[in-house]
Structures are given as structure tokens and as C-alpha cells.
Regions:
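Alpha-helical cap/lid subdomain in secreted, periplasmic
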Residues: 1-96, 100-118
């Protein structure tokens, strides 16, 4: 068993070895709120993902912050509907919001090359 960072570096290297573009995404935030804002885990998983991306020269999409900002704009009551079973796993509607965020950022990272694969 290895660390989160070890596995992320391994995935980046394996991706590149196959000629693909490595993109690391931080985890999306859980449905945890304080003072009207969703909690960001900027000092653990999101930070570690960003550090590996920087160390390996991979693209990084900070879903923790990007999705949290969207959740904040929607509000706690609306976002609660995305998490019917627990505060970690979204339903399809929540997954679609996350997916739209990833697609939006892929279009910005390397215009043209990866965007052609997105609908």
C-alpha cells in the first residue's frame, strides 16, 4: 500500500507512457456547510492532487474549489438534493454539474486538442 501521491504520480506516468494527456482533478467537495459556504478541503486531498500535478507537470483542475463555488451560488438547500444517500456521493444531477465543470475546464486548458472529444 502506498500514499495517495504515489498512486497519482503512477497514474500520470502511465498515462503519458500511452501517449495521452494527463489531467489531475481534485476531489469534489462533500455536502458539508458552515456559515452559508460549502467546506473546501484545501489542505488535504485537493492540495495533494495539486502538488502532484505541479511536480509531474500535469494539468490540474481544482474541482474542489470550482464545484464548491457553484454549490455556494446554488445554496445549501438546492445542493442537498444532489446528495440523497450521504454527504459524499451525488446523484445523477450532481454528477452532471461536476461533469460540466470538468468539460468547461478541459476546453480552457488546451483549446482544440482535447475539446474535440467533448460534446
Amino acid at each position: 500500500v502506498h500514499t495517495f501521491g504515489w498512486y497519482m504520480r503512477k497514474y500520470v506516468r502511465e498515462t503519458r507512457a500511452r501517449g495521452a494527456t494527463a489531467i489531475i482533478c481534485s476531489l469534489v467537495p462533500r455536502n458539508n456547510w458552515k456559515d452559508g459556504k460549502v467546506f473546501r478541503s484545501a489542505d488535504s486531498w485537493a492540495l495533494w492532487a495539486k502538488q502532484v500535478a505541479e511536480q509531474e507537470g500535469a494539468y490540474f483542475i481544482d474541482l474542489n474549489e470550482l464545484v464548491a463555488a457553484k454549490y455556494d451560488a446554488l445554496g445549501e438547500t438546492a445542493v442537498k438534493k444532489f446528495f440523497p444517500a450521504d454527504n459524499t456521493h451525488t446523484n445523477e444531477e450532481g454528477a452532471r454539474l461536476n461533469m460540466a465543470t470538468v468539460m468547461e475546464m478541459i476546453r480552457k486548458i488546451k483549446p482544440g486538442s482535447l475539446a474535440k472529444y467533448l460534446k
